[in-house]
A protein has these predicted regions:
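Glycine-rich beta-alpha loop elements in corrinoid/cobalamin-binding modules
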Residues: 74-176
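Short acidic, S/G/P-rich loop/turn micro-motifs used as interaction or catalytic elements
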Residues: 44-47, 112-114
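N-proximal accessory regions
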Residues: 1-7, 45, 139-141
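Sequence-level detector for compositionally biased, low-complexity segments
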Residues: 16-19
Length: 176
């Protein structure tokens, strides 16, 4: 864990939501995987971890050979402000690596009111907000979930929309 992160945790409410290390968290050797996926939920840890679809997809993606899927949640306002003040980019709970260093940033979006949180997470991560500003060196930004039946409001911010039930979707987009 980053020393800067250790310094700010005592100043926020519910710091345990930002440190990972739970039972059944999937850890892999990042030098032995081909693709790293930051699986992001645009709400707090407690809301995201109670989402059955997120838990299922986390397991499905981690069962793909050569893929390590890590979790990331939107920080609460106090933590977001502390992270911005300390220049700590949004990170994954398993490795604490910044999600901007991943190959894919995948959002699970269940409702339209989460769209602003998704954009805020990209900003906090240091990822160019608009898909047109990204290069081959930045992660592919993917969004799925029930809100993707109307993905037009966030079309400028994502590279790929996955429409349909993620649990039943083929893993082909990740394997590409």
């Amino acid at each position: 864990m980053d020393k800067r992160l250790e310094r700010i945790l005592p100043r926020v409410q519910k710091p345990a939501r930002y440190v990972g290390g739970e039972f059944n968290a999937i850890m892999k050797d990042k030098s032995k995987v081909d693709t790293r996926v930051a699986f992001c939920f645009p709400d707090t840890y407690e809301i995201g971890m109670s989402n059955l679809g997120m838990r299922i997809l986390y397991g499905v993606m981690n069962n793909i050979e050569g893929v390590w899927c890590e979790r990331c949640f939107a920080p609460w306002g106090d933590m977001e402000q502390e992270m911005r003040n300390a220049n700590i980019p949004l990170y994954a709970l398993e490795s604490f690596d910044p999600i901007k260093d991943f190959d894919i940033i995948a959002f699970s979006i269940g409702y339209e009111m989460a769209f602003p949180a998704m954009v805020d997470m990209l900003d906090l991560a240091g990822v160019p907000l608009h898909a047109s500003e990204r290069t081959a060196l930045t992660p592919l930004v993917v969004a799925g979930g029930t809100a993707m039946y109307n993905c037009e409001p966030i079309a400028d911010f994502i590279d790929l929309a996955l429409i349909g039930e993620g649990e039943e979707m083929d893993v082909e987009p990740i394997e590409l």
